[in-house]
């Protein structure tokens, strides 16, 4: 769980850099599928970025880890992402 939360927070920090006023919709979809959808949906969302085999395997391992989290914390992480993206710190 700590790994998934850490990854999410690092991702949010990268998305909210001063050089980026908005989150790439495709990247946001990857994160949402990571947290809420099936492994096959997550893999399909990642394919847009042409990951190599090591990246695919790492993503699959991460998805398995995230899927062990209860539903409520995953929903809370999505809400946190939305809140951070809408924050004045990201604009």
Curated annotation (Swiss-Prot):
UniProt-listed CDD domains: Secretoglobin
InterPro entries: Secretoglobin, Secretoglobin_1C-like, Secretoglobin_sf, Uteroglobin
Pfam families, per the entry: Uteroglobin (PF01099)
GO cellular component: a single term: extracellular exosome
Tissue expression summary: Club cells (nonciliated cells of the surface epithelium of the pulmonary airways).
Gene Ontology biological-process entries: embryo implantation; female pregnancy; negative regulation of interleukin-13 production; negative regulation of interleukin-4 production; negative regulation of interleukin-5 production; negative regulation of T cell proliferation; negative regulation of transcription by RNA polymerase II; negative regulation of type II interferon production
Primary subcellular site in the record, as a coarse category: secreted
Superkingdom classification of source: Eukaryota
Molecular functions per Gene Ontology: phospholipase A2 inhibitor activity; polychlorinated biphenyl binding
Task of the protein: Binds phosphatidylcholine, phosphatidylinositol, polychlorinated biphenyls (PCB) and weakly progesterone, potent inhibitor of phospholipase A2.
Name of the protein in question: Uteroglobin
Lineage of source species: Eukaryota, Metazoa, Chordata, Craniata, Vertebrata
Gene encoding the protein: SCGB1A1
């Amino acid at each position: 769980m700590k790994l998934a939360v850490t990854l999410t927070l690092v991702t949010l920090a990268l998305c909210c850099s001063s050089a980026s006023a908005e989150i790439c919709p495709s990247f946001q979809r990857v994160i949402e599928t990571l947290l809420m959808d099936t492994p096959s949906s997550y893999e399909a969302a990642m394919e847009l970025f042409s990951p190599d085999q090591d990246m695919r395997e790492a993503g699959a391992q991460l998805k398995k880890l995230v899927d062990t989290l209860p539903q409520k914390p995953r929903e809370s992480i999505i809400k946190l992402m939305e809140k951070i993206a809408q924050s004045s710190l990201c604009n």
